[in-house]
Design a protein with these regions (language model features):
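Structural alpha/beta surface segment adjacent to cysteine/selenocysteine redox centers
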Residues: 1-58, 166-238
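Extended cationic-aromatic binding surfaces that line active-site or macromolecule-binding grooves
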Residues: 150-152, 160-161, 180, 188
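Short, surface-exposed acidic/glycine-rich loop or hinge patches that mediate macromolecular interfaces
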Residues: 157-161, 227
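C-terminal cap of thioredoxin/glutaredoxin-like
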Residues: 45, 51-143, 151-153, 159, ...
């Protein structure tokens, strides 16, 4: 289910950043992924063009074209060692997933966090021209707002800092567009038996802090409400 949601999410987000993502309903198979990994490793000093080209071929399910890019197929041990070393580097950087950009100790996961990186680079005076930002999300400001009788189901967790951050923005959205919010409380991940790594907890906290600062939302001095506090909070909705 998570993989399918990720595919749909990528497809919906891409146009807002003037990008394209193929209409696919399944992930590339293991053999194709392995071939793409071999192609990347065999090229040595990778460039962004290499990554884009191999990525396009991967999602197009074009195994033969990927194979043609490999002059000498690396052995399984070489590929496994490279993946292991990179996984260790990712852990040292303080993250736990792919699609992560790291600059001076700060992680940026996914395209929607790249504007934060660009903002940081601009503050350092590294922008070389007066052109528009590289990473811009398209949006339309609707002036004539009509009450369309829409509803949004909000899956809300008392322990999730993202749920906390969303409350202010969702409230503003509801007032501006006449949207009804249906809050549906869910148990925190840990209380559902899921394991949350130190890297994940740390990244989420740091990420929420910068998003909170960006939207003028107080965030800090955290006391974990896990357990009894969450249960007491949810009892209000019983």
């Amino acid at each position: 289910m998570l993989a399918l949601i990720g595919l749909k999410d990528a497809n919906m987000i891409a146009p807002h950043y003037s990008l394209k993502f193929p209409l696919v309903n399944h992930l590339p198979n293991h053999e194709l992924i392995r071939m793409a990994q071999s192609a990347l490793i065999s090229r040595g000093n990778l460039t962004s063009k290499d990554l884009i080209k191999i990525g396009d071929l991967l999602w197009a399910n074009d195994q033969s074209s990927i194979e043609n890019m490999i002059s000498s197929i690396p052995g399984d041990e070489v590929v496994d060692n490279a993946l292991s070393l990179n996984a260790e580097s990712r852990k040292k950087f303080g993250h736990y997933l792919g699609g992560v950009f790291v600059y001076e100790g700060e992680c940026y996961w996914g395209i929607d966090r790249l504007p934060l990186l660009e903002k940081r680079l601009k503050k350092l005076g590294l922008k070389t021209n007066d052109g528009p930002n590289v990473v811009q999300r398209k949006h339309n400001d609707i002036k004539d707002i009509k009450n369309l009788d829409l509803e949004i189901d909000v899956l809300w967790s008392a322990r999730s800092p993202y749920s906390y951050l969303a409350m202010k923005l969702l409230s503003e959205l509801s007032k501006k567009y006449g949207v009804k919010l249906n809050y549906k409380i869910i148990l925190p991940m840990v209380m559902r038996g899921m394991k949350v790594s130190l890297e994940k907890r740390t990244y989420i906290t740091k990420d929420c802090k910068r998003i909170a600062d960006q939207n003028d939302i107080p965030f800090g001095n955290i006391i974990d409400p896990l357990g009894y506090a969450v249960e007491r909070c949810y009892s209000l909705y019983a």
